[in-house]
């Protein structure tokens, strides 16, 4: 199994290094990751400047100023030969649950892998301690995929409780929960009196029902949420069509 491994926390982050070590016990792994923390980069792609890479002695590749999406794009199309069998992103330091997925560079890296035609996993730890637990869970899932491929055409967004492995209760297939909109902005002043702004914390949970990713992780279960790239709201087609007919927008051109 050939694995392209990326993340959004940066090439030296403990999550990706712990996972790379575990994966190399049974797979051919190429790390291509940002040279610094790019959390919250979502699906951004660098188009207005060139990208430089640096290869470390162990073969890991850092993309200077690159986003997670840049890293997977370069990894698949230029840096990993032969191409990978699967793209894995993580282990993220902190969860990617509910609405977090729309901002997450971790999920975006997996999404880019799927967009380019490869199976893809995004893996996050609900904390900053038990990376070995998340690595063990990921390795188990990948070994299962090697034995019996999962042909859904979907990204698997995996969130692991920050617990020792023997305290994990099991695994659940979940849906994304949701949060209240975030509204906090934290202003500060620099030494010259200029105002600086920090984005505040995420909103609180507003949908954390029993079938959500929030609930699974809170209860000690690994959450596996299938995600897809198509954002079309098919259920709204008729509503939007009827509205356009009723208001006559095209009659005003």
Curated annotation (Swiss-Prot):
InterPro entries: SurE, SurE-like_Pase/nucleotidase, SurE-like_sf. One of its GO terms (molecular function) is metal ion binding. Keywords: Cytoplasm, Hydrolase, Metal-binding, Nucleotide-binding. SUPFAM superfamilies: SurE-like. GO terms for cellular component: cytoplasm. It is found in: Cytoplasm. HAMAP family: SurE. Belongs to the SurE nucleotidase family. This is 5'/3'-nucleotidase SurE.
């Amino acid at each position: 199994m050939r694995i392209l491994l990326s993340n959004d926390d940066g090439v030296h982050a403990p999550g990706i290094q712990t996972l790379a070590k575990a994966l190399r016990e049974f797979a051919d792994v190429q790390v291509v990751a940002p040279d610094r923390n790019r959390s919250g980069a979502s699906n951004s792609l660098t188009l207005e400047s060139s990208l430089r890479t640096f290869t470390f002695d162990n073969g890991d590749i850092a993309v200077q100023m690159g986003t997670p999406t840049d890293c997977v794009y370069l990894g698949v199309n230029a840096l990993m030969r032969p191409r990978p069998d699967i793209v894995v992103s993580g282990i993220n330091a902190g969860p990617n649950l509910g609405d977090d997925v729309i901002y997450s560079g971790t999920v975006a890296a997996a999404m880019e892998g799927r967009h380019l035609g490869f199976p893809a996993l995004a893996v996050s730890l609900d904390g900053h301690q038990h990376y070995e637990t998340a690595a063990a869970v990921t390795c188990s899932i990948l070994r299962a995929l090697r034995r019996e491929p999962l042909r859904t055409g979907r990204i698997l967004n995996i969130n692991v409780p920050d617990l020792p492995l023997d305290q994990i209760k099991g695994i659940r297939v979940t849906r994304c929960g949701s949060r209240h909109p975030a509204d906090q902005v934290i202003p500060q002043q620099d030494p010259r009196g200029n105002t600086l702004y920090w984005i505040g914390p995420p909103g609180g949970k507003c949908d954390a029902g029993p079938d959500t990713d929030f609930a699974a992780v809170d209860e000690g279960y690994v959450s596996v949420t299938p995600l897809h790239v198509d954002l079309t709201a098919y259920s709204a087609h008729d509503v939007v069509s009827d509205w356009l007919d009723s208001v006559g927008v095209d009659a005003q051109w």
